[in-house]
């Protein structure tokens, strides 16, 4: 698969790197981030190029991890034309066929969206760094955007039960964040929301759903490896993971990334 290198336009942009700080994924590890100067007003094409280079958007900020002796934050994307549901995903898909999807620009967010977000954070992530939720946090994180962002809403009759915040890309969409009704745990809405995004990208005639970063040594991130085939940005190349990995293989991959040296990961598994 081909490497992606910054075009002249991207070389003209200004970037900043943060001082080391506690890693939000791995205990007892430090992290650094490269940020695009927020003074730049970027369009879909520029954000798409940056995403192919491993950048990610959060609110008005576009960033990429740049850590010393660690490369575990692997940008990952699902090639939608080749994606095949596993048995668990098929069950989640079937279980939610009574839901209706609508699309709404994030700038049209209302109280109903914040109320659902607040419940989700309070009940599902009270131990995380997004607790306690606030309207200001919600707006800065999910409503404000430097690009074309939208909600994929899921409704049960007249009740909003799930919202996926997405960025439009020139080759697909980037899944920014999903929140849902914590009382609907039997629906597996986290799984279904990703499946719904994959199907939505197919209807647009585009190629990928970007799932952000997969961190092999972070158990809470390993759900992303279940969407196969999955493409990973390794050593500047998008390489394909053709099947789900065992816990031992995931740990082996994580160990190989605790260095700044190029990966020698098994080419029979990742191609």
UniProtKB/Swiss-Prot annotation:
Keywords: Acyltransferase, Cytoplasm, Transferase. It is found in: Cytoplasm. Its main location: cytoplasm. GO terms for cellular component: cytoplasm. GO terms for molecular function: arginyl-tRNA--protein transferase activity; leucyl-tRNA--protein transferase activity. Transmembrane segments: none annotated. Its EC number is 2.3.2.29. It catalyses: N-terminal L-glutamyl-[protein] + L-leucyl-tRNA(Leu) = N-terminal L-leucyl-L-glutamyl-[protein] + tRNA(Leu) + H(+); N-terminal L-aspartyl-[protein] + L-leucyl-tRNA(Leu) = N-terminal L-leucyl-L-aspartyl-[protein] + tRNA(Leu) + H(+). One of its GO terms (biological process) is ubiquitin-dependent protein catabolic process via the N-end rule pathway. It holds the Pfam family ATE_C. The keyword Metal-binding does not apply. InterPro entries: Acyl_CoA_acyltransferase (IPR016181), Asp_Glu_LeuTrfase (IPR017138), N-end_Aminoacyl_Trfase (IPR030700), N-end_Aminoacyl_Trfase_C (IPR007472), N-end_Aminoacyl_Trfase_N (IPR007471). Belongs to the R-transferase family. Bpt subfamily. Functions in the N-end rule pathway of protein degradation where it conjugates Leu from its aminoacyl-tRNA to the N-termini of proteins containing an N-terminal aspartate or glutamate. This is Aspartate/glutamate leucyltransferase.
